[in-house]
From Swiss-Prot:
UniProt GO MF annotations: ATP binding; ATP hydrolysis activity; ATP-dependent peptidase activity; protease binding; serine-type endopeptidase activity
Keyword Zinc-finger: no
Chemical reaction(s) catalysed: Hydrolysis of proteins in presence of ATP
Domain of life: Eukaryota
Assembly notes: Interacts with PEX5. Interacts with TYSND1. May interact with enzymes involved in beta-oxidation of fatty acids, including ACOX1/AOX.
Protein name, UniProt field: Lon protease homolog 2, peroxisomal
Keyword Transport: no
Entry's Gene Ontology BP terms: protein import into peroxisome matrix; protein processing; protein quality control for misfolded or incompletely synthesized proteins; protein targeting to peroxisome; regulation of fatty acid beta-oxidation
Every Lon proteolytic domain range: 651-837
Its biological purpose: ATP-dependent serine protease that mediates the selective degradation of misfolded and unassembled polypeptides in the peroxisomal matrix. Necessary for type 2 peroxisome targeting signal (PTS2)-containing protein processing and facilitates peroxisome matrix protein import. May indirectly regulate peroxisomal fatty acid beta-oxidation through degradation of the self-processed forms of TYSND1.
Species this chain originates from: Mus musculus
Pfam families per record: AAA, Lon_C, Lon_lid, LON_substr_bdg
Amino acid sequence: MSSVSPIQIPSRLPLLLTHESVLLPGSTMRTSVDTARNLQLVRSRLLKGTSLQSTILGVIPNTPDPASDTQDLPPLHRIGTAALAVQVVGSNWPKPHYTLLITGLCRFQIVQVLKEKPYPVAEVEQLDRLEEFPNICKSREELGELSEQFYRYAVQLVEMLDMSVPAVAKLRRLLDNLPREALPDILTSIIRTSNKEKLQILDAVSLEDRFKMTIPLLVRQIEGLKLLQKTRKPKQDDDKRVIAIRPIRRIPHIPGTLEDEEEEEDNDDIVMLEKKIRTSSMPEQAHKVCVKEIKRLKKMPQSMPEYALTRNYLELMVELPWNKSTTDRLDIRAARILLDNDHYAMEKLKRRVLEYLAVRQLKNNLKGPILCFVGPPGVGKTSVGRSVAKTLGREFHRIALGGVCDQSDIRGHRRTYVGSMPGRIINGLKTVGVNNPVFLLDEVDKLGKSLQGDPAAALLEVLDPEQNHNFTDHYLNVAFDLSQVLFIATANTTATIPPALLDRMEIIQVPGYTQEEKIEIAHRHLIPKQLEQHGLTPQQIQIPQHTTLAIITRYTREAGVRSLDRKFGAICRAVAVKVAEGQHKEAKLDRSDVADGEGCKEHVLEDAKPESISDTADLALPPEMPILIDSHALKDILGPPLYELEVSERLSQPGVAIGLAWTPLGGKIMFVEASRMDGEGQLTLTGQLGDVMKESAHLAISWLRSNAKKYHLTNAFGSFDLLDNTDIHLHFPAGAVTKDGPSAGVTIVTCLASLFSGRLVRSDVAMTGEITLRGLVLPVGGIKDKVLAAHRAGLKQIIIPQRNEKDLEEIPSNVRQDLSFVTASCLDEVLNAAFDGGFPVKTRPGLIDSKL
């Protein structure tokens, strides 16, 4: 047995103050440093740049360091441990701190504190004896007997540990090689002891006292291990398993305690799981995987982290609806009535749902279609999906995809990762409990993309009827049949949907509502819903249709009805205040009547409170019911109108025309303004325009320059070269909104023609269409939304490309009756329709028509 090599520490040591841990000589401890003095000590004495200094510290236990260095030091513990920092790791979260790995060297005693700031420094005296231990044992028999007794208990403890034979032999060699005088400190830091017991061992300067205090701790640990071995069930692989070197860090339990009851419950749960696996209707491949996992679970200790993961996996497998489904309601007549009651208009969408029901009647094993409702916000795309599920009698589940940027949200995480879980598809199936629900994939056009993968690519398999019968979630790692699920996606635009994903879905356009449709929706659905939410009845409030029309035209500007619904909510809140005040006034009037009757017999005291008299005098009658919401009440509640019809005012001078634009929020009218000035022939474009729109402007000016003589268009100097010493500025108002697309071509031509001819464009005309350099008008998209926007703005005539005439069939008949349409195949027809009296070709005087 070797002896301790002499350790000599400096007489002055910087002090590291710890509170919740005790460091013993020969042991290693990890501690966190976050107080002012300790941080200053680490930065000044341990760290030099990025390197670690070999500085001996004095670790003082059971002494909290004040949070501020302005506070005085608390009383210091008398005995500490000289230590060497092995590792220092810094961090700034949640606050600046260091984590130190320190090794104890020897004991010392504080003689005098030399300074307290910026960190404490003390004069110390080393306490551990440096004499050779064998020489001490020869001179003192009691110390030698204690040493031998301690060694025997230490060997017995090592042999009782649940470790392999080689590991036990290695620990035996370690005990033999360690100095005997170091064993009490080292084993005390390893076995289960409290900080109070460790502090007592630290204070035991004498070796005899140290051995005497440590032996009972070893005996207690040995008895606990014996009790644990009696209560444990023997296993075949006990001799092969290896646990951590630190022995038994938990209190041994007694038979019949809560731990035994929990173990019995776990065993019962495993039996139930095994029974569910045998009786489940899962496919053969999934059944094989579950049987294999349940066998692993039986052999696995409950303390292993993988035990809970495997159990959760098996519980999910038996809960999934592999073959459980609901029966569809295929009554087309009842479905039509239900859809009409829930939603007004949307004829195209309702027809597609009824077609699906009809085909399901003829073919039971029809694969679910993949529908995608595309339209502006607030038109009812999400609520239609819920109505479809209600019509079919199926379960409904909504999956919000807006902002999802991790493909694991769709496919799940592999079970090798910590915190793994299935994807949203499998989770949704577990939630609804059937394999043929209606899944609403909301906002599919707002999927993101990140380093974790592309969720839109993960949806390709889900939304492909030819592949989704074999969908494999990463967490399950077995195939699940999604062919019976009816997937409905919603989007505001198809522009941001990847082409491969768009190709897998059947696009159904859901356009915005007309004013008449909004009025019907308001009085059928919105107003009754708001009355119910605010506790009102139709006998208390009356909103005529002309008031609803005023709200639609002057307080909202949208394709859907969300803002309209909020306006009705504001009206109902204002009426609720009036109704509540009226009930309060009625009660006060009743009380005042009673007081007046009694006042005939009594005199009013002079010191009566004036508030009660004035309150009674100022009482007003409650409002008459029902409260009528007219234009005056509308202005009081909602304030001044937000939108005004300013079309005629803005077209009061040449160089202004009205175009029609399409946005994901629906159609809208767009003004185009032009002005000319002396310059060098430059064309300036403003209004946040895209490249396509800029090219349309250059096309328009080129066509007008080439046809200037034909229409007798001149600049301010009378020249047919429109850009000769002239600059042109084209502006598209709402400059904060980005604009792009080819459909503004005809509007730009009309605006510039008005500028150079000095004629006004008709104030009731709007137009849309793409142009070519030869003056042709090409078709554009979004005709229905654009026409509805023009109708909302009060325009009367719409100029559209001739090849878009077929799109007029989708426009409601009442809108078509209010508007007149001009279909144009070339710019000549556009100009003739945009100006009063047409835009005739100017013939050059003095020319004689040849008859040859």
